[in-house]
Amino acid sequence: MKKVLFGLVLAAVALPLLAQQKPVYLDASKPIEERVEDALSRLTLEEKVKLTHAQSKFSSAGVPRLGIPDVWTDDGPHGIRPDVLWDEWEQAGCTNDSCVAFPALTCLAATWNPEMSLLYGQSIGEEARYRNKSVLLGPGVNIYRTPLNGRNFEYMGEDPYLAGKMVSPYIRGVQQNGVAACVKHFALNNHEVNRHTTNVIVDDRALYEIYLPAFKMAVQEGGVWSIMGAYNLYKGQHLCHNQYTLNDILKGEWGFDGVVISDWGGTHDTRQAITNGLDMEFGSWTNGLSNGASNAYDNYYLANPYLNLIREGKVGTTELDDKVRRILRLIFRTVMNPDRPWGSMLSPEHYEAARRIGEEGIVLLQNKGNVLPIDLNRAKKILVVGENAIKMM
């Protein structure tokens, strides 16, 4: 009897001790900010820097020593992109990376129906989650300014208010699945010609009334967890590391607590990347489609060049800790969230959602001259022009 009592007492003492030994950052019952600070305190300098840049075409490293997993991103706004090889743009040939092709976001905006936007986000978020993605690189809310912008199909039209009201439910739908939406391209990225070198000139009223409202609503109404910078420049600084747009407006005026991710190839300077609001660097020295330096991740602007500046005492770690806090916050909201659902792929519900959204987005146009339907007796050939005519995306 004494042995039994002793065993019970020992168990009663040991169980609380074991519970106390569980690190705060691994305890999902704790507030995220407590978990972030606990994890931050355990990281080495090298581990912190590794969190801020890519390790492959679409992923960034975690911290295996602490059980912090990698972050996996994927395109795109209206369908989950097939996986590519680790350091190449060729498709990996996986057997589980099909997806439902949802209508373009132009069509979604044309529904004028936030319920359809929520359904869209929920459905595509489930597909991203099933594929184990942490971040969905979309949606886009750049304002239509020219019909020649080849990426207009990724965006939600020319009305800032409509775009903002439609993007917020999409974000909430995606993030219900424990997948971060990544609203892009912040900001003023309204055409594709010379997109890496164009310095956009815009007055403050147009900036705040036309180009920023949808992004602001994405942050303050949608609660988005990540934002992607743009390729172009504003006030002479690239928008993936721009003091005014990222630090002053996004993180300052709007109180954004998430992660700023560079567009692929959008980072150009280590010191500006350190100080001007960029948190995670992806795709440097690549055009985002085919070209790129091979296995160059340790040489990214926020990789060894950043680490060396710290070691040499030329920059401090205040900015680094802020970046890492944001990245850890993202990780705890997504891949380390034990309550996120499993997701699903190619389900009848997703196909039905795509059909419903497509139907509601139909816009009736006047058929002048009876152009449609095409008379095959008169039109023997139809010309399809452009890269997508020959390339499988």
PLM features: residue spans?
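Bacterial Sec-dependent N-terminal signal peptides
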Residues: M1-K22
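Glycoside hydrolase catalytic-domain context in secreted enzymes
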Residues: A19-M393
